[in-house]
């Protein structure tokens, strides 16, 4: 009998916003009490609600995660405490397939992502033109849009996998180009896991990469899927509702995340860690 593989190996806040694309055609498997199938009133909407930026207004549900008072966040029924030390790749597999991978599936999924990781020609030329005083989230939005223009295939699943695979290198290059460290950039090592490719591109002096990989991997797993109602996820859904591409939707979500009332929470969490 096959056992599901809780791998203890060593990807960015943007992943949690992919739920609006990855699961819009899937049945609800994860909502506590199957909330989405119930016909129930959640809010008495008044004219006052129209002028408060949707504060306190339920705007979405999530098919992949839910929260309980005792165990906190669950991904597809698994308490986050059971997943925190697993590899980001295995959690991405979980969010796609609603179950953890076997050892064989884990290996094959990693190979799949590795085959998609190379950035298209033209990305670095675009990054080289951006103002160094620009906010990194603005750089990220431009980078995601550029990826879509250069390598989008207009298939939500393929584009999602491609974006996941390309983000570590893109984000590492964004840091380097903003800081002016554009010489001696290490080649992208596709044999490394996703987080390892990011830290390899950063190539920071005096940093224990093994420790950094472990911290970033756990951090990313913890932030990978947090429900359907936060600002960036809502924004991504709104853009996607017009049948925009995955890249346009994710860029819009990152623009929403850039504001201090939303993204600052992630930054403060990382500073705490």
Model-found features: residue ranges?
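Cationic, low-complexity basic patches in intrinsically disordered or flexible, solvent-exposed regions
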Residues: 8-9
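Hydrophobic alpha-helical bundle cores within soluble ligand-binding/oligomerization subdomains
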Residues: 14-26, 30-273
